[in-house]
């Protein structure tokens, strides 16, 4: 194998693939990156056996071939090199040689046959979405995913297909984010796929703001292809909890909130929350919302803003950081908040098909 590639192109490939390589693994070959050349294409592949990524770029190929080399050392070396182009070559049973100007480096390598094969997706069902739309949908839901391994199913994002609509949901049991998009699949088709959060984060990184993303659906895996990058991931096993009762909660009160103003006030009053509970009381009076937090070790914070509310006193407590996460993942000037009482969840919606649920916290007497 022998090829010449632009250092910038190589750097872009490394950025796309390096976070897929596992940091700690008992299987040495998984710390490698597989390098293949075909005609004038250079292909990099990395996997942790759950998430696999394959990236393609242009290169001047003199000899076709394939090797796998230790990714960490190789990535660090490329970062330190200064020449515009690099030459990489190897022969059967020999080390890989990296040449940069007058400098020459050799890395131990392994054969392609030692590297795990990518899962087959040839028979997978597929559909397309604008890459930017898929990226946004995942960004607006993945923040709510559980980071607790004990809640295994909730550590992934749900992709549900039904009636020609793709629904993406993330939840940790205390908050939920949901967004819908129409897709070009037969309305009779339905399926549910729980995507690991690592794969979701990689898909977000690989999706550009232009072009299409193709999604491949299989029984035990899904794949996304975009911008010369293919990601294949195994799915999380288990059944995602039924969230329909939560999102269909009847809201007796619906009001519009100025998003930026509420973000500012929540950041201020959150400084006075108890570190163990993080609770802010929302008090609604005619024309006004007051936010209150107090902590015996810190003091008390109280702020207010004008709202379009005309009922009797209504109080409910929320985690301000969960509320801020929701507000930060909307771009609207106004968001709609629906609540019914102090004990049922608040439902926040915006104009971009986003629906967010936040569970209330216990109200404490001031």
Swiss-Prot record:
GO biological process assignments: DNA strand elongation involved in DNA replication
Organism of this sequence: Chlamydia pneumoniae (Chlamydophila pneumoniae)
InterPro entries: DNA_clamp_sf, DNA_polIII_beta, DNA_polIII_beta_C, DNA_polIII_beta_cen, DNA_polIII_beta_N
SMART domains reported in the protein's UniProt record: POL3Bc
Gene Ontology MF annotations: 3'-5' exonuclease activity; DNA binding; DNA-directed DNA polymerase activity
Major subcellular location class: cytoplasm
Annotated Gene3D superfamilies: 3.70.10.10, DNA Polymerase III, subunit A, domain 2
Description of how the protein assembles with itself and partners: Forms a ring-shaped head-to-tail homodimer around DNA which binds and tethers DNA polymerases and other proteins to the DNA. The DNA replisome complex has a single clamp-loading complex (3 tau and 1 each of delta, delta', psi and chi subunits) which binds 3 Pol III cores (1 core on the leading strand and 2 on the lagging strand) each with a beta sliding clamp dimer. Additional proteins in the replisome are other copies of gamma, psi and chi, Ssb, DNA helicase and RNA primase.
The protein, known as: Beta sliding clamp
GO cellular component: cytoplasm; DNA polymerase III complex
